[in-house]
């Protein structure tokens, strides 16, 4: 019988084992900020590494970029973020709590089991629903809300010593615009022909009204985005290609297919720049949630930046001489919620010799520690430690000499370490060690000088 995975179990494991800590904890914290501990940063880096390998390094089409977080304010005017990047905000007049009106309604609909979609609703329609159904405040139960108003999600700051409109800038709410404004630079210097893509990994910031569910939705987050430019008319073919590519990537690196689904956006849901959008959703303990968004952004962004900047964003086909503004397909995923999905999907409990064994069945490429080395006895520390130091040159490794071997295995199982190497008294004579597999718990004896080759083969992706 499959174990029931709860958010409480995942959060407890993450905090207790050094994956994720509350931000600014010694000062009482800062709501919905998280720091990644020794295991968390390794796991995040592994996720970014395998995304980069599959989407950029191994792709004959794609190249990378690392654009600035702070950009000219006009970038966000052109993209539409200054005018329309907002959520519907309302306050409870009784307890002063703030809510997103659409989420308030969606939670009410879910609770009541109603079959209603509010996608595309105006503020007026949402307010009418709240009044008609007497939707209560989730905090205090009152039905006394302010009118709904727009709340811009961008963090505003200033460059230089004066705080006026000329020095106003924003922390970027997405990495995509840094790619669009560099389209001509990248195309010219890389000499790429359409179709080609530009990818990047970086921090983004959104002043979310109601962040939550641990690291699923935070105000500071990391994105992995690809903007793939193609000829108009070939856009849906590439849209379907990247849609499937993203799903295959998730399954290849360990997510169970039954916990994933495609959700195509209805016409009324589509963003103003999109003609087609599909979300790959994951079945989290709190329900289905967006994991990866794949959007056909058409030529909207390049056209907007061409109009606002005066820079020519057209592409000339080197064979036919045809000029056009390329269409863009965007697969965009958040590293933090991807890490949460991998933790949830990998978490398992089983009974072994009357005890509960907690194990993270992470794909070896994602596991923060690849191998742990144990001496069977402290008398064997010196030889075992030398093996550990040699392996650490090639793999993230841990050394553990305290407690019984069984207890040491359990500690590594809980953090997802795929392999454990034990140096015992026989090792001194036969120059072999025991390697134990995390998932099967099977053990094999292998020559000490073959351990690194064995691990390289097993950890290859």
From Swiss-Prot:
Record's subcellular location: Cytoplasm
Binding site for substrate: 100, 174, 221-225, 330-334
Annotated residues for binding of ATP: 206-208, 216-221, 290-291, 334-337
Pfam families: HGTP_anticodon, tRNA-synt_2b
E.C. number(s) listed in UniProt: 6.1.1.14
Known role: Catalyzes the attachment of glycine to tRNA(Gly).
Name by which UniProt lists this protein: Glycine--tRNA ligase
Organism of this sequence: Caldanaerobacter subterraneus subsp. tengcongensis (strain DSM 15242 / JCM 11007 / NBRC 100824 / MB4)
Gene designation: glyQS
């Amino acid at each position: 019988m499959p174990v029931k995975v709860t958010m409480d179990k995942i959060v407890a494991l993450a905090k207790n084992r050094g994956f994720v800590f509350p931000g600014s904890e010694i000062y009482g914290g800062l709501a919905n900020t998280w720091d990644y501990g020794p295991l968390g940063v390794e796991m995040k880096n592994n996720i970014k590494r395998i995304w980069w390998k599959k989407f950029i390094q191994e792709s004959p089409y794609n190249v990378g970029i690392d654009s600035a977080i702070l950009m000219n304010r006009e970038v966000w005017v052109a993209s539409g973020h200054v005018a329309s990047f907002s959520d519907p905000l309302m306050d409870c007049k009784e307890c002063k709590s703030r809510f997103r009106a659409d989420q308030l309604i969606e939670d009410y609909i879910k609770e009541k089991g109603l079959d209603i979609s509010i996608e595309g609703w105006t503020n007026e329609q949402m307010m009418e629903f709240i009044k008609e159904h007497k939707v209560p405040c989730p905090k205090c139960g009152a039905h006394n809300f302010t009118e709904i108003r727009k709340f811009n999600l961008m963090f505003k700051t200033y460059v230089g010593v004066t705080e006026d409109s000329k020095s106003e800038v924003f922390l970027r709410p997405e990495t995509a615009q840094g790619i669009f404004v560099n389209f001509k630079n990248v195309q010219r210097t890389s000499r790429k022909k359409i179709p080609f893509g530009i990818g990047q990994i970086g921090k983004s910031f959104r002043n979310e009204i109601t962040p939550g569910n641990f690291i699923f939705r935070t105000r500071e987050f990391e994105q992995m985005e690809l903007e793939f430019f193609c000829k108009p008319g070939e856009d849906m073919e590439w849209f379907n290609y990247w849609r499937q590519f993203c799903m295959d990537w998730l399954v290849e690196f360990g997510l169970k297919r039954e916990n994933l689904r495609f959700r195509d956006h209805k016409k009324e849901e589509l963003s103003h720049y999109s003609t087609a959008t599909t979300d790959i959703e994951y079945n989290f303990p709190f329900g289905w949630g967006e994991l990866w968004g794949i959007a056909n952004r058409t030529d909207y962004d390049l056209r907007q930046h061409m109009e606002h900047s005066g820079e020519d964003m057209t592409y000339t086909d080197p064979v036919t001489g045809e000029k056009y503004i390329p269409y863009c397909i965007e697969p965009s995923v958040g590293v933090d919620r991807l890490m949460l999905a991998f933790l949830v999907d990998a978490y398992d409990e089983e009974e072994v010799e009357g005890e509960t064994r907690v194990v993270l069945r992470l794909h070896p490429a994602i596991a923060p520690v690849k191998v742990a080395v144990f001496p069977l006895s402290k008398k064997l520390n010196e030889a075992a430690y030398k093996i550990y130091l040699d392996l650490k040159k090639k793999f993230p490794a841990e050394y553990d000499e305290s407690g019984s071997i069984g207890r040491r295995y359990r500690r590594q199982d809980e953090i997802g370490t795929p392999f454990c190497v034990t140096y015992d008294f026989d090792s001194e004579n036969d120059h072999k060690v025991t390697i134990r597999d995390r998932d099967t718990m099977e053990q094999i004896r292998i020559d000490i000088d073959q351990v690194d080759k064995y691990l390289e083969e097993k950890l290859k992706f």
